[in-house]
Amino acid sequence: MANKGKYYMTTAIAYTSGKPHIGNTYEIILADAIARYKRAEGYDVYFQTGTDEHGQKIQEKAEAAGISPKEFVDQISGEVKRIWDMVNSSYDNFVRTTDEDHEKCVKKIFKKLYDQGDIYKGSYEGLYCTPCESFWTESQLVDGKCPDCGREVQPAKEEAYFFKMSKYADRLIDYINTHPDFIQPVSRKNEMMNNFLLPGLQDLCVSRTSYSWGIPVDFDPKH
C-alpha cells in the first residue's frame, strides 16, 4: 500500500499523582485503535503517550509516602507503562517529563521564549486549588469552591513567569476562521473561540516558586 504521508498522534500524558485508572486506559485503547487503523490505511504513524511527573500534588504525595518525588513517579510511571503494554498498545514512544532529553528541551525552549520577549516575570494572585494545581478568580468558582473538583480553595500570591499568549490571540483567531477544519469537532472549535480567544486570551503562568518538584529555570533557580 502506498505511503499516504506522516500521521502524528498523542494521548494526554497520565498524571502520576496516583495509579492509572479506567479513564486513562480507555484513552490509550481508543488512541491505539486509531493508530492501527491509520497504519492499515498506509500512513506513517508516530504514536506517542507517556506520563506527566511534576507538580505540587506529586511532591506532597511523595512526602506523605516517605520517599523522594523521583522514586514516587518512577513507581507510578512504571505501573502506567506496565498496563499500556499489558493491553498491547502500539505506541512508538513513551515519554516521561522527568526524562533528561525532555528537561533539556523544555529549558532550551523556555530560554528562547524569554530571550525573544515572549516570557516575562510577574506575580500571580488568585484562589488556588492544590489538588487541581490551578488558580481561579472569584467569578470562576462554583458555590465558592473549585469548579473542577469541588474542593475548597485558598488565597495565594506568588512570583511567576508568564508566557504572552495574549500576543498571539489575533493570529490564532484569524487562522481558525480561515481554516475551519483546524479544530474538530465544531463544538470544540466554538468552545475555544467563545470561552478563551474572543473574550481575551490570558497570559499563561509557566513557573512556580511555592514548591521545588519541577524543571528549574536555569537563569532564576528559585523558579
Residue ranges and their predicted role:
Residues 2-119, 133:
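N-terminal Rossmann-like or analogous alpha/beta NTP/dinucleotide-binding catalytic cores
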Residues 2-49, 101-105, 149, 155-223:
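Structured secondary-structure scaffolds
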Residues 17, 68, 77, 89-90, ...:
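Generic serine detector
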Residues 58, 62, 136, 146, ...:
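Short clusters of hydrophobic/aromatic residues that line enzyme substrate/ligand-binding pockets
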Residues 64, 110, 139-140, 198:
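Alpha-helix boundary/capping detector
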Residues 88-96, 114-127, 139-140, 154-156, ...:
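Short secondary-structure capping/junction motifs at helix and strand boundaries
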Residues 116-173:
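Cys/His-rich short segments
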